[in-house]
Amino acid sequence: MKELMVVSKVTTNGVGSGGIIIGAATSAASEASVTPPQDLRERVKDYGQDDVFALWDELSLEERDFLIRDIRSLDLARIDRIIRCSFRSQGVPTPEIEPVPETSVSKVEERTMDERARWWKMGLKAISEGRLAVLLLSGGQGTRLGSSDPKGCFSIGLPSGKSLFQLQAERILRIQRLAAQSNDDTFVPIHWYIMTSPFTDDATCKFFESHGYFGLDADQVTFFQQGTLPCVSKDGRFIMETPNKLARAPDGNGGVYSALKSSKLLEDMAKRGVRYIDCYGVDNALVRVADPTFLGYFIDKGVASAAKVVRKAYPQEKVGVFVRRGRGGPLAVLEYSEMDPSMTLEINQTTGRLRYCWSNVCLHMFTLDFLNQVAHGLEKDSIYHLAEKKIPSVHGHTMGWKLEQFIFDAFTYSPSTALFEVLREEEFAPVKNANGSTYDTPDSARLLVLRLHSRWVVAAGGFLTHSVPLYATGVEVSPLVSYTGENLEAICRGRTFHAPCEITY
């Protein structure tokens, strides 16, 4: 189900493709009476969802009004199609899984300096011509981090105290400057599309406003919301969170495709002259936003989609990996939970690596044409992943299903996908769990940033002093100063920096 989209900076009258919304919510107040509206009762009964009115008699007039509006906001035909298609897909045989062909992966050790320089230059040229947009997936709250704020508002404890949003915004600012310098100082802003959710939208917008968009122009940032879908029981019936309110959940980060479509932002990108979209998740402290090298590689390969990948750290690492579905089939992501344990141990006898070693880290590049294709294709297929969860309900917590699409679902539609290996110590510092957990914490991400930046400073001729062991500290280089360690010699050579500190000039 795709609710009426609310888009900061962009408005839309769309409600998601392919469905009919039942009536107008504005008439609900006049409809709350002794019994539910006849047309609505018949409509929900047609789809086997008449349980939504089970507690009608216990509701006040105001609560009845709310329930009517809640149900009328649903595209019941679309939701019913999603539930039926998703349930039917369970247990259906899937194509045979094969490893990714070696020729589909650009490996770090195989790249020449000339290639890297050429891709960097190609990427900067495309950016300076306004061909690249950045798409941020930021619908999640920091619940596992102990915060109800959007994840991007979170600070991982760097010397600067900067939030994830600020780090990413400043990397965009730096790349804009580098692109302008490479093109006779012709400045073209990179447009930043930020997908929020109903739970994070208001807080995200206010955070950007209160921080002056971190130096970006307000009109180069567009916020839009992903949709939600009703949570359903094991037999496909809607779960009621309260007697007059449906239990809902965001439709997964793959909801970005239908959200872009219904918000008419794909058309907006086309009007801006965008051809390529750099897409990533918010919870990576080392993400190279708008990476010119990756963009240049993508353009050079001439593919519809690409993904940065890292090698699995060990066989049992709980990450999804890229695979080929079926002989000669498309590349796709196989979740760790979908892998047979024996698969995780298989070795490629030629390379000595794991056969299934290329981890998905949510760093993707798409053409705009391909995004349009995916937005229509996923909507037509209506097959969502079923995530079994404890759903808050009128009966306490009920075991049921959340219906989700994932960003990587797009790859099965791609006529051509290329994988680009990166080093996790340079580009992947996930922030998913609270400090005290064994992995992917703010502390572990902070140390990855400080260690990388310390290596940059030493390579540029700087020196470090420290009052605690260096493995537990380091220096932070402002993204406004350097994107990948470039241009630091003039700042660092011969200077001594006491860790921890931030280098800003």
Enumerate the language-model features and the residues they cover:
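Structural beta-sheet core signal
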Residues: V134-L136, I194, F223, C279, ...
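Catalytic core of tubulin tyrosine ligase-like
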Residues: M269, G273-D278, L286-A290, L295-V475
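An acidic- and aromatic-residue-enriched active-site/binding cleft used to recognize and process polar
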Residues: L137-Q141, P150, L158-P159, S197-T200, ...
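N-terminal glycine-rich phosphate-binding loop and ensuing alpha1 helix
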Residues: I22, S27-D219, P230-S233, I239-S258, ...
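Intrinsically disordered, low-complexity regions enriched in glycine and serine
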Residues: G14-I22
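Conserved beta-loop-beta/alpha segment of the NTase-like Rossmann-fold superfamily
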Residues: G212-F214, A218-E317
